[in-house]
Swiss-Prot record:
Part of the phosphoribosylformylglycinamidine synthase complex involved in the purines biosynthetic pathway. Catalyzes the ATP-dependent conversion of formylglycinamide ribonucleotide (FGAR) and glutamine to yield formylglycinamidine ribonucleotide (FGAM) and glutamate. The FGAM synthase complex is composed of three subunits. PurQ produces an ammonia molecule by converting glutamine to glutamate. PurL transfers the ammonia molecule to FGAR to form FGAM in an ATP-dependent manner. The keyword Hydrolase does not apply. It catalyses: N(2)-formyl-N(1)-(5-phospho-beta-D-ribosyl)glycinamide + L-glutamine + ATP + H2O = 2-formamido-N(1)-(5-O-phospho-beta-D-ribosyl)acetamidine + L-glutamate + ADP + phosphate + H(+). It comes from Halobacterium salinarum (strain ATCC 700922 / JCM 11081 / NRC-1) (Halobacterium halobium). Pathway: Purine metabolism; IMP biosynthesis via de novo pathway; 5-amino-1-(5-phospho-D-ribosyl)imidazole from N(2)-formyl-N(1)-(5-phospho-D-ribosyl)glycinamide: step 1/2. InterPro entries: PRibForGlyAmidine_synth_PurL, PurL_linker, PurM-like_C_dom, PurM-like_C_sf, PurM-like_N, PurM-like_N_sf. It is an enzyme of class 6 (ligase). ATP binds at residues 37, 476, 513. The gene is purL. This is Phosphoribosylformylglycinamidine synthase subunit PurL. GO terms for molecular function: ATP binding; magnesium ion binding; phosphoribosylformylglycinamidine synthase activity. Substrate binds at residues 80-83, 102, 227, 299-301, 516. Mg(2+) 1 binds at residues 79, 514.
Length: 700
């Protein structure tokens, strides 16, 4: 490990001397792109992060928002584990789950749900399938073992991820105000206590590793930078954390993630504008002869750092012992520098704020992305429908989510496969449901980063609206390639601006998130990928699902769209086009339609456009007969719109302030019949299911 020349000069100026080897390694990791957001920090001010519901916004391990009408607080956070999941898809993905769950614990919350947004290279690529298989197994094994359901997410395939997949995981938790904890250290003299797994050498330099392009030999050369998870210890840590909170033993908390103990402990005291004195020899270790740098920076999993009052240390140790967890009193909070001692010598002595917040921002050159030309194909209607329904990006994700236990915890009331997940808030005792949507479409942002990111916000809000829910807050995972490339950084800038404007348009604060850059490899950079996780709520009003009842008229709330840019239609059949302008006004209209008593089914427009939305609504017992004005109207993926089956189309049209277009009617024959101009194509439910079963068919 080594600091760059300019950073080393800054460190020498701050310390008044050359750094020790341990200090240099600590600064390199904490000042890395992964930890310090050096290339993106200046862009993040574009996001609005305040609302009446926000209790804790950006800067902590997870954000906290209040659920209106209840005494419950919801925590939400999102993290990336991209590079590790390429090197070791199973452990990389599993430890990504573990890390975001511990972020939830750090706030005093109990984790109730996970969502995963996964991005891989072309589905036809054998290595992409290998990565998909390993990532899903890792998430499944870890999430199932700790008893937290994975209830929402998305899986996307795009050639930009061939050499660098993305694994973005969000977690939602519950807490009440009296149990809320933050990471900021509070009082000099309090003890710092490390609870959980013993520290080994795994994950060394993980933060630095995540701040570089993936090399061609990364799967072997970078294996030591990938952590190894133990979900059974994580489950014990979850329950121990609850017990510590029950007994009011926690003053502040932070999980050990990027940069390990050095990152967690220095950030805790920096947030409290305090210092610390830490004895590294006191850390419980599982490997012999570890040196100071290894103890400081190892990213061994399932560990928490707590600030504890001196009088409560024995009680904390007793709780750890009860749950068969290691426990070390490693130091105390001070008013001075952040100091670490090892083998009787001082190996780190630096201001905590310089370590945690002193990395200078990097000004990156950028070029403005250019809009694509319009060059649309003109296939036969049947050819187009079959091609789009058979595409991996419109395929059923059942193969993925059936591996997850989405029922554990007895809260799940809207399951994977619907527009958004729904989780019963039993504590509110009034039927309130927490809703969750997560994901992004790289085809949209590869086409036009600003418009595609804006649409990502509208799409996730529409998912909630189709479930009758109103958004409370969002967290983002901003994934990009090498920021030193002006074209890449220009796309990243446009993506951030578009997502910020889109979240403003849906009136949803962005309360936290994660930036992951240097997602670049020998095959090139990824598409700018703005994963968004939106948490919302719904009162006791029931809403229908997406399956047709076969007993109503079909209308399109939000009207037809024309642009085909970023669509599966163009991916499957060739051509280019501009991305359609999403209208956030449709979100409220979809929500109103979903909660009406005369609504029988509702499903939003997304991947594959109107054609796929209708196909997904068809069941063996209910079908649809519709007329659409053209191929663009059938396949445009412009969000903020939904198909609604209603008993009273006239009343619905009169009630909404957005265009409502009559499409046709639901039937009881289990077939989809689509007419465009003078051409009609019919596909039955079995054929649709076969088309959309490509992932399961190829991987089972």
């Amino acid at each position: 490990m080594s600091l760059g020349d300019s950073d080393r000069e800054r460190v020498v100026a701050a310390l008044g001397r050359d750094p020790t080897p341990a200090e240099a390694a600590l600064f390199e990791n904490l000042w890395s792109e992964h930890c310090a957001y050096r290339s993106s920090r200046s862009l993040l001010s574009a996001f609005d992060s305040d609302s009446e519901a926000v209790v804790v916004g950006p800067g902590d391990d997870a954000a906290v928002v209040r659920v209106p009408g209840t005494d419950q607080l919801v925590t939400v956070g999102v993290e990336s584990h991209n590079h590790p999941s390429y090197v070791d898809p199973y452990d990389g993905a599993a430890t990504g789950v573990g890390g975001i769950v511990r972020d939830t614990l750090s706030m005093g919350a109990y984790p109730i749900a996970l969502a995963d947004a996964l991005y891989f290279g072309d589905f036809d690529d054998e290595h992409a399938r290998y990565l998909l298989d390993g990532v899903v197994e890792g998430i499944s094994d870890y999430g199932n073992a700790i008893g937290v359901p994975t209830v929402a997410g998305a899986t996307q395939f795009h050639d930009g991820y061939t050499g660098n997949p993305l694994v973005n995981v969000a977690c939602v938790g519950l807490v009440t105000e009296d149990r809320l904890v933050t990471a900021a250290a509070k009082s000099p003299g309090n003890k710092l206590v490390l609870v959980g797994n013993a520290t080994g050498r795994d994950g060394l330099g993980g933060a630095s590793f995540a701040s570089e392009d993936l090399a061609e030999d990364a799967e072997t050369a970078d294996r030591p930078a990938v952590q190894v998870g133990d979900p059974y210890t994580e489950k014990l840590l979850i329950e121990a954390n609850e017990t510590l909170l029950d007994r009011d033993l926690v003053v502040a908390a932070r999980d050990l993630g990027a940069a390990g103990l050095g990152g967690a402990s220095s950030e805790m005291v920096a947030q409290g504008e305090l210092g610390a004195r830490i004895t590294l020899d006191a850390v419980h270790q599982r490997e012999p002869e570890m040196n100071a740098m290894e103890i400081l920076l190892a990213e061994s999993q399932e560990r928490m750092c707590y600030e504890v009052a001196p009088a409560d240390v024995d009680a904390v140790r007793e709780v750890a012992t009860r749950y068969d967890l290691g426990c070390s009193v490693i130091g105390e909070v001070t008013t001075g520098n952040y100091v670490c001692e090892f083998d009787g010598e001082t190996v780190v002595d630096a201001p905590a704020t310089v370590l945690a917040d002193g990395a200078p921002a990097t000004d990156q050159p950028s070029t403005v992305p250019q809009a694509p030309a319009t060059d649309r194909p003109d296939p036969a209607l049947g050819t187009a429908i079959d091609a789009v329904l058979s595409a991996p990006n419109t395929a059923s994700n059942e193969w993925v989510y059936r591996q997850y236990d989405h029922e554990v915890g007895a809260r799940t009331v809207q399951r994977p496969g619907e527009d958004a997940a729904g989780l019963a808030l039993h504590e509110a005792d009034d039927g309130t449901t927490v809703a969750l949507s997560a994901g992004a479409n790289p085809g949209w942002t590869a086409c036009q980063p600003y418009a595609g990111a804006y649409a990502t916000a509208v799409e996730n809000a529409t998912n909630l609206a189709a479930a009758g829910a109103e958004p409370l807050a969002a967290v983002d995972c901003l994934n990009g390639g090498n920021p030193e490339d002006p074209d890449v950084y220009g796309g990243f800038e446009a993506m951030v601006a578009g997502l910020a404007d889109g979240c403003r348009a849906i009136d949803t604060p962005v309360v936290g998130g994660n930036v992951s850059l240097y997602n670049d490899s020998a095959t090139g950079p990824i598409a700018p990928t703005p994963t968004l996780a939106v948490v919302g709520y719904r009162d006791q009003h029931p809403v229908p699902g997406s399956g047709l009842a076969g007993d109503g008229d079909l209308v399109l709330v939000g009207g037809h769209a024309d642009g085909l840019g970023g669509s599966v239609y163009l991916q499957a059949l060739g051509g280019t086009d501009q991305f359609p302008a999403a209208d956030a006004a449709g979100v409220d209209a979809v929500r109103e339609a979903a909660t009406r008593a005369d609504t029988l089914a509702v499903h939003d427009i997304s991947d594959g456009g109107l054609a796929v939305t209708l196909a997904e609504m068809v069941t063996a017992d209910a079908g649809a007969t519709v007329t659409v004005p053209g191929l663009a109207a059938l396949f445009s993926e412009c969000p903020g719109r939904a198909v609604v089956e209603t008993r009273d189309a006239d009343a619905l049209q009169a009630a909404l302030d957005v265009p409502v277009v009559r499409l046709g009617s639901a039937t009881t024959d289990g077939t989809l019949s689509v007419t465009v101009d003078d051409e009609t194509v019919t596909r039955d439910a079995a054929t649709i299911r076969d088309h959309r079963g490509v992932i399961a068919r190829e991987l089972d």
